[in-house]
């Protein structure tokens, strides 16, 4: 079982507050999704991004956990970065 964080912030390039979760005047609720595979994590991330009309400057989620350990990160484009890889954060 995996968990992936789903969250957004305002984009400073669009005069939005990057410390708030309001995007285009709409509050975007943070969520944690539980799924069975990395592929499902990637799918739910892209659905969250598309359903909330997020840009790359809004995306703050994507941390992937197995149990209590973070094992990777899913970037805005849906790519999975394994812990220890170049773009893992």
Tell me what each language-model feature is.
Residues 5-9, 33-36, 65, 75-77:
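A structural detector for beta-sheet-dominated domains
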Residues 25-39:
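A short, exposed loop/beta-hairpin motif centered on an aromatic-Gly-Thr core
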Residues 17-21, 47, 85-89:
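Surface-exposed beta-strand edges and their flanking turn/coil or helix-capping segments
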Residues 12-14, 43, 79-84:
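Residues in flexible loops and secondary-structure boundaries
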Residues 50-89:
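Short, mixed-charge low-complexity intrinsically disordered segments
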């Amino acid at each position: 079982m995996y968990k992936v964080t789903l969250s957004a912030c305002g984009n400073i390039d669009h005069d939005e507050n990057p410390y708030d979760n309001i995007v285009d005047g709409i509050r975007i609720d943070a969520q944690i999704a539980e799924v069975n595979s990395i592929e499902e994590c990637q799918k739910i991330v892209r659905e969250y991004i598309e359903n909330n009309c997020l840009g790359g400057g809004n995306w703050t989620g994507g941390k992937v956990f197995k149990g209590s350990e973070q094992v990777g990160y899913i970037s805005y484009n849906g790519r999975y970065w394994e812990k220890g890889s170049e773009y893992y954060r």
